Design a protein with these regions (language model features):
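An N-terminally biased module of ancient metal coordination in phosphate/nucleic-acid-related enzymes
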Residues: 1-57, 142-144, 156-239, 248
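Catalytic core of soluble alpha/beta enzymes
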Residues: 232-265
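Extended substrate/RNA-proximal surfaces in nucleic-acid metabolism proteins
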Residues: 36-192, 254-258, 263
């Protein structure tokens, strides 16, 4: 896992001039990232990616350009992080019933930030302990929906998430909407509800999505009166499940970029 300053340096090396660091449910790296961006002459805005439950489905909402000291936002993020630990304990208890011990402590030991522990870290522990060969098997055998160690989890509500971001003076953007596998009806319902709650935009490009995705979501952004975001979805070096740092192509014509509304960049 790269420290925030290294992420900023890598972005700078790609020619990136404006950056938002959007760790999941945590803002602890923003001060370090902002200082490094300033030293390199880059624009920087505060960011965070918040886990949300919407109609029993998991959705991620990116908050941008907000006041990091806002108490309501920080309280919401703390609640989400505490929920991760509660879920880990429940999963570990189910695994123990299957004869797999040590998952709680093992997953925490593998997480760079214990507050940000996830099923991926549990999968890493299962691999390390020799219970499965790879992450795919960890999810298909134990951790996936409906499997023996599956634990449903309620993240923040969409309403509370958007309210917290807006209350902190920020912009709320739906992250990587092309990755959820939603039907056309579900997408319409999500975008309409998000807009009605005060949401600002959707990511028109994210990670490794293709040109057709960009054009499709640009049209959807225009249709629902939402601004367009663009993110690389970079997670770590060598992890190709996201995207390449700094790889954000130009937005399709007629998009209103979310960064045009930034106040602190």
């Amino acid at each position: 896992m790269l420290p925030p300053r290294e992420v900023v340096r890598l972005a700078h090396a790609t020619g990136c001039t404006l950056l938002a660091l959007t760790d999941h449910d945590h803002t602890g790296g923003l001060a370090e990232a902002r200082a490094e961006a300033a030293a390199l002459g880059m624009g920087f805005v505060n960011g965070v990616e918040i886990s949300v439950t919407w109609r029993h489905r998991s959705v991620h909402i990116v908050g941008l350009d907000f006041d990091i000291e806002n108490e309501a936002l920080q309280n919401l993020l703390a609640q989400v992080r505490q929920g991760r630990l509660k879920r880990l304990a429940a999963i570990a208890a189910k695994l123990e019933k299957k004869g797999i011990v040590g998952a709680y402590d093992g997953a925490l030991a593998l997480a760079a930030n214990p507050e940000m522990v996830s099923r991926t870290h549990i999968a890493d522990y299962l691999i390390q302990a020799g219970h499965v060969r790879n992450k795919a098997q960890a999810f298909s055998k134990y951790l996936g929906d409906g499997k023996p160690a599956s634990v449903a989890h309620e993240w923040a509500s969409l309403e509370d998430c958007v309210a917290a971001i807006k209350g902190a003076g920020g912009l709320a953007v739906i992250a990587h909407p092309m990755r959820y596998g939603f039907s056309a009806t579900a997408k319409r319902n999500l975008f309409e509800e998000f807009k009605a709650l005060g949401g600002d935009g959707i990511e028109v490009h994210s990670g490794n999505c293709d040109k057709n995705d960009r054009l499709n979501y640009a049209l959807l952004a225009e249709r629902f009166g939402l601004m367009a975001g663009c993110g690389s979805d970079f997670h770590r070096l060598g992890d190709y499940s996201g995207g390449t740092l700094g790889a954000c192509p130009e937005l399709p014509p007629d998009c209103k970029p979310v960064w045009a509304s930034f106040q602190t960049a």
